[in-house]
Amino acid sequence: MKMHLQRALVVLALLNLATVSLSLSTCTTLDFGHIKKKRVEAIRGQILSKLRLTSPPEPSVMTHVPYQVLALYNSTRELLEEMHGEREEGCTQETSESEYYAKEIHKFDMIQGLAEHNELAVCPKGITSKVFRFNVSSVEKNGTNLFRAEFRVLRVPNPSSKRTEQRIELFQILRPDEHIAKQRYIGGKNLPTRGTAEWLSFDVTDTVREWLLRRESNLGLEISIHCPCHTFQPNGDILENVHEVMEIKFKGVDNEDDHGRGDLGRLKKQKDHHNPHLILMMIPPHRLDSPGQGGQRKKRALDTNYCFRNLEENCCVRPLYIDFRQDLGWKWVHEPKGYYANFCSGPCPYLRSSDTTHSTVLGLYNTLNPEASASPCCVPQDLEPLTILYYVGRTPKVEQLSNMVVKSCKCS
């Protein structure tokens, strides 16, 4: 009993000491020059490791990047930004070990055809639904290594719409059979019919994986209005034989008039960039020879929104821009020219700033046993991927590198 009382008094004394010395931390604060040097070397190793390269490729002799390659790079970067925003809202993070290695990016535009080829015959053509077909056979041999697939379509305003909002639903088209449904539901969205243009993204990973494994199952995707072929009165009653019209319009599908002058070929390429397309992230087989380095990450805490706007002295994310040419001496990366890698820095005060009871216990235990373990340090918590465009010889490549941008930090 006496021993327990002595331990309790020691803990209380330590708590009081920690309250007085809130800025105490055994993690040494490094100068910026030293931090940047270490961060640059870490990034150099990370990029080469994720690409499974032992040394940087030779700079390409190509000075002009084709428009289609730049369009793929821009689409991928926009998609990753959207995906990160969705994960933040849902407080979810990917945990697959395959997340570590770089992914090859493939873009497949919708197969263009006559108007009736993009519509279904269940309801009057062009009124209630649109069909989108894609040829992904070129990556079938690597189908089992699909990491993620996104269907993207650009909604454009419809000034002549009679309603301000309409619900659309995305389906995978299945082979007709009397025992199964013709469609498989993927997702739905309530959208404005007017307003400004916006990209819509749907996760179609499972659907595309099925297409890659069984080519005959690739019958396309369909966007239709909710409860097609009926119009509803304000009280909810159905008006038979009166069809609700799809008033949501999509770029590259609804035959909008694009009047313009100049080089028609250039205009066509620019319009193709906004047409419906699939973006596939594939893991090359040679990058799956050894296990990745993925892991769980918790919800963001000390992020860029807070740290970049406040003069926080304790643990926070700090801005750090890496220029590929100046800092790494690399000329083989065409896009981007550099990026904000950022880093975590600042002391981790006991009790007040530690975000978990675990960190507090570590601090107290370290005071009791200074030789036994390390105290909490400021480390990355949430990281974002980076998209790069580079050449191997004359072959352009667009790839996604995971966990390259520090977005938030924590004491651990």
Curated annotation (Swiss-Prot):
CDD domains named in the record: TGF_beta_TGFB3 (cd19386)
An annotated GO BP: salivary gland morphogenesis
N5-methylglutamine modified-residue sites: Q293
Leader sequence segment: 1-23
Stored PROSITE patterns: TGF_BETA_1, TGF_BETA_2
Claim: ATP-binding is one of the keywords in the record: no
Top-level taxon of the source organism: Eukaryota
Glycosylation sites: N74, N135, N142
PANTHER family in the cross-refs: TGF-BETA FAMILY, TRANSFORMING GROWTH FACTOR BETA-3 PROPROTEIN
Family per similarity comment: Belongs to the TGF-beta family.
Protein name: Transforming growth factor beta-3 proprotein
